[in-house]
Amino acid sequence: GDMRDPLVARRVLAGAEVVVHLAADVGGVAYLAGRQAGAFHANHRIGINVIQAACFHRCRRLILIGSPCSYGPNSRLPLVEKKLQEGFPSGETGCYGLAKLVVSETANLFGNALGIETVTLIPGNIYGPSDHFECNRSHVVAAVLRRAVVSQLLGRKTFSVWGNGSATRDFVYVDDVARTIAQAVTAAHHFSGDVLNIGSGSETSVRQLADLVAETVGGGIEPEFVEEELVGYTHRVLSNELARSVLG
C-alpha cells in the first residue's frame, strides 16, 4: 500500500509492538534536486502518517530512519548527534533532510505525550544489493558502478563521475545498517527521543571510490570527472560513538 494514505499506515501498523519506519520517497542528489517540494511533501506526509498510526495503536517503540542530509552544511566533522539542530538542511538534498528532521521531532513530541519510545537512526551513505541503479534515482556508489560497467560493455575507456572527486562520504554496507536496526528493536535501553548515527566512521572520497570501481571492473577503464555536475554536500562523515555506547 501507499503510506501516504493515513488509512494504509493505520492498517499496516495494526498489532505492531515495535515499528521501524523505512518508507520513503528518496533517490540521489539528481533525483531530489529535480523535485524538492514533492520530496519534502511526500516524506513529511509518510512520516506523519506513521507517527499517527503508531500513536493510534499505542505501539511501544517507534524507530525512525533519518538522513545525514538533516545536518547543516557547515556542521563540523565528524557529525555528532548533539549538533543536529545547529544548522539548517540546505542544498539539493536539504528537502529530504528537512522532512526527516521534522518527522523526527514530531515523533518525539507525540512519543513523550503518549509514552511511546522514539529513536532516530541516521545511517551514512548506504550501499549494497537491491540499491537503486536507475539513472535518475541512484546514489553515488550505484551510480559510479553502473556507469563504469556500461562504459566497459560499450568498449569505452572512461566513465563519468560527477564532481572533481574531492567530495567525501561515510559509506556503510546495508547489512551493517540492518544489524544495527535489529539491535535497536531488541535493545534494553529506554529510548526517549534519542538520535544515533550509523556509519563506518571513515571518510572516503569520491575519487577513492571511483578508483576502486575502476580497479574492480577492470579492462583499463578510468574515471573521468565532470566538475559541473551536482555533488551535494562537500564532506560527510559520522561519529558512531554514541550508537556504540547505547547499542553495544
Whereabouts are the PLM-identified features?
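SDR active-site strand-loop-helix element
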Residues: V19-D25, L62-P68, L121-P123
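Short-chain dehydrogenase/reductase
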Residues: F40-H44, F88, E92-S104, E134-A142, ...
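C-terminal substrate-binding subdomain of Rossmann-fold SDR/epimerase-dehydratase oxidoreductases
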Residues: V150-G248
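Conserved sequence/active-site signature of Rossmann-fold short-chain dehydrogenase/reductase
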Residues: R4, S70-Y71, I126-G128, V141, ...
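Hydrophobic positions on the long internal alpha-helix
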Residues: I46, V50-A54, T106-A107, T180, ...
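NAD(P)H-binding glycine-rich loop region in Rossmannoid oxidoreductase-like domains
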Residues: M3-H44, A53-F56
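Active-site Tyr-X1-5-Lys
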Residues: N49-I51, P73, G91-G124, A143-L154
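Conserved Rossmann-fold NAD(P)-dependent oxidoreductase catalytic core, especially the SDR/UDP-sugar
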Residues: I48-T93, A113
